[in-house]
Each structure stands twice: as C-alpha cells, then as structure tokens.
Amino acid sequence: MRSSLLLLVFFLSIGWARYCVHNEKSWCQGHNIWGWCFHNKSSGVFNCDDNAFCVSQEQLKNKKSSGCFLRDNSSICCCNDADGCNLGFIGVQPKYAHGQQCTNSMEVPNEDIRQFRPCDDPFCYSVLTAEDDGGPTTVTRGCHSRKMVMHHMSKNEDDKYQNNTKWRETKQIAEMPSCAEILKDQPKVNGTTSMCVDFTYDQEAEDGEEVDEPIKMKGRLCCCAGSNKCNEHAMWADEGISLTEMLEEIEARKVPVDSSAPVNIILSIAFSIFLIHF
C-alpha cells in the first residue's frame, strides 16, 4: 500500500514543474514540489537552484517560502512560491545590483501605444516586425526572461491540454538566441550593453484561414542590459547583425582557442627530424 502511494505521488509530481528565470538561458524548469528558484545578488546568477543551495537549507524544507540569506557578504535568495519568482529579488536591497526596469509596451500601426507597468528583468528586449517589402512596423517592448518563462509555461500547458495558444505570439523570439548570448562580449556604452539581431520569417495563417502564399516578414530582436528602460527607443536604425552572423559567432565561441598549438606542432616536427638525422 505504501509503495503504491509513493508511486502515485511520483507520477502526480512529474506532471508539474517550477519555472524560473535563468541568467544565461532566460528560463529553466525545476520540480514543482521540491524545486526552488535561485538568485545570487553579487554574481547575478539566476537559475533553478542548480547547486542545491536552497534545497539544502533546513529552515526551508517542506515550506513555500521566499527570502534571502547573507552568505560571505552576499545576499543569496530562494523562492518556490510562484513561477519566475526569482525575478522578484531584483528589487530587493541592494536594488538593481543585477537587472533593471524595462519599458513594457505594444505599438501597433494606426492604434494608440499601449503602455503597461514597467517590469524588472536581467534583460530588456524590443521586437520589431514588418512586411519584408516595407510597410508599418509593430513593436513589442518588455522583459525578456519574464516573457520566456511565460512562453514555455503556455506551451507546456497547450501541449498537455490543448487549451493555451498564447505561446504562438512569442514563438519567433523563443527560437532566437537568448539575450545573454546576444549581448556576450558586447561593449558597454554609457553603462548599457545592447545589440540587435535581424531575421526573416513567413507569417503563419490564422486558424481556419487559407492563403495562397505566406507573407514574407522581417523582424528584429534587440536586447539590452545595464540601465533602466534601455529598450525604450530601439528601432531599425540601430546597430545590428543578421541571425546567421549571430549563430556563427555563438558557434565560434565554442571552439577553444590555443595559440600555442601550432608552435608546439612545429617544435615537435623539428625535434623528430633532429632525432632521425642525428
């Protein structure tokens, strides 16, 4: 009886997940029952308690909680009370040590700009889209990590129950490199790091709509970090690179660079020749 009960608890628990913000991947997925979201206010790390700091704290065991510990002059924060809850630590003292406030708005052609409450995030973003051959631009601005957590929560729910299609609205940016990858190695200018990536795509038809040819679209994802509302003015004229160039750059980072290797090879060959002849 006991083993059957434990098995039931296991199968029920694997059906749920705790979604957290991740400073490199934008989002991560932990366990809903014993999973924690983590943030280190000194290092700027956000993750799903990858090093098991939170889960190892005796005072947190079997509790829903949110708070910070002082460890080695650093505030280390844990929460498991909501998806993406480690975003809430950005505004905890010291405020904005990592992360900033982002503009949160929607600009649709021929409509009034819709301004929403600013949000806190490790990365701010803007997405610009328009028909490839020209035309008015639609702009969405907001918090990138928060948006990616919401995207994957929605998609997971839709995959299971076919009742939530909100993820389709953010499918394009979810398939792009993360803001951490886009901004890596970019210089700071006046305290802000920023970069835009250009891409193209075919606009999908609405449900039930038939089209002869999909509409060719162009898009631009701009990421920034370092100053409040740094995403407020990102537009087509800003500096940017193509998605192809960005992906090539990301792949190049994975190749270890060892400038001593060619020298070592030459010395090895020379030494071999010396041994043969002498």
From Swiss-Prot:
GO CC terms of this entry: plasma membrane
Keywords: Cell membrane, Glycoprotein, Membrane, Signal, Transmembrane, Transmembrane helix
Keyword Signal: yes
Source superkingdom: Eukaryota
Cytoplasmic side: 272-278
One GO BP annotation of this record: positive regulation of detection of mechanical stimulus involved in sensory perception of touch
Residues of this chain annotated as glycosylated in UniProt: N40, N73, N163, N190
N-terminal signal peptide: 1-17
Gene disruption: observed consequences: RNAi-mediated knockdown results in no visible phenotype. RNAi-mediated knockdown enhances the touch-insensitive phenotype (the inability to respond to more than two of four touches) of mec-6 u247ts mutants at 15 degrees Celsius.
Subcellular location: Cell membrane
Task performed by this protein: Plays a role in mechanosensory transduction (touch sensitivity).
Descriptive protein name: Protein mtd-1
Gene: mtd-1
